[in-house]
């Protein structure tokens, strides 16, 4: 039994190594073609994903104000379907005549390729949004690059917002730029990141995969910002105090000890900030 488990784990590791090799080969091919994503240092972003949805909802409400919803009462299934389709196409034509152009950037977390058109989900700091990628809109070469891209790659997308037939606000891509190539494989999306040890040791993966963890960090950042603003408005001054000290006092806790090579002396991790603030 142990031998079977070891063989299975070895096979899985071999598969992972092969996938990692493929990703590095894709990067090498991009670099040889003069499309090294790591050479791109700036990309103009006009909106976050949540901003796009808010902007489109407001624009839609303005353009379609007073337009009643389609009434399918008394229609059979086929007639109702045609009425809903006609209403959608009319609404879409009104919105497309005065489109909302946006530019976003984020990590691709999902991709579904369907011949000449594809869908993907782009995730940024404030959420995620679906993008619609058509070969005729972005060109054959770029579409081929997109089809070869992997989950975890970071894309810049320029286009206009629209609402799909299912009601989801999306972006119709007109320009796309591969900003960064993901060389590592993200955990499987459905089950998420459940390994507690990995979540703490590789916090960056936790922030990518778990929305709840990211929200905690965002809230923490906002709280610290408000505390700083509150104190700064009252003429408090922020100062830095030493983190490594010769004598860690102020409490009975046992300090962490290490050796400072540059000074050739033993130091301790501080316990209390109060002692230095009082000096």
PLM-predicted stretches and their roles:
Residues 1-279:
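Class II aminoacyl-tRNA synthetase catalytic cores and aaRS-like
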């Amino acid at each position: 039994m142990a031998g079977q488990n070891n063989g299975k784990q070895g096979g899985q590791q071999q598969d992972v190594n092969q996938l990692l090799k493929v990703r590095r080969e894709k990067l090498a091919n991009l670099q040889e073609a003069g499309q090294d994503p790591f050479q791109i240092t700036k990309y103009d972003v006009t909106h976050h994903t949540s901003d796009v949805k808010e902007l489109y909802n407001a624009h839609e409400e303005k353009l379609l104000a007073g337009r009643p919803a389609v009434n399918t009462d008394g229609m059979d299934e086929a007639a109702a379907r045609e009425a809903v389709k006609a209403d959608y196409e009319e609404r879409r034509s009104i919105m497309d005549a005065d489109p909302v152009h946006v530019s976003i950037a984020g990590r691709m977390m999902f991709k579904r390729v369907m011949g000449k058109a594809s869908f993907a989900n782009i995730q940024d700091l404030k959420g995620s949004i679906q993008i619609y990628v058509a070969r005729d809109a972005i060109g054959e070469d770029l579409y081929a690059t997109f089809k070869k891209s992997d989950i975890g790659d970071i894309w810049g997308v320029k286009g206009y917002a629209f609402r799909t037939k299912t009601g989801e606000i999306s972006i119709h891509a007109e320009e796309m730029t591969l900003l960064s190539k993901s060389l590592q494989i993200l955990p499987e999306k459905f089950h998420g990141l459940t390994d507690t040890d990995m979540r703490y040791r590789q916090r960056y993966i936790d922030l990518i995969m778990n929305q709840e963890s990211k929200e905690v960090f965002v809230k923490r950042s906002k709280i610290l910002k408000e505390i700083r603003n509150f104190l700064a408005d009252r003429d408090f001054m922020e100062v830095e105090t030493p983190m490594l000290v010769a004598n860690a006092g102020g409490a009975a806790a046992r300090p962490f000890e290490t050796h400072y090579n540059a000074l050739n002396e033993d130091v301790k991790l501080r316990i209390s900030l109060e002692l230095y603030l009082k000096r």
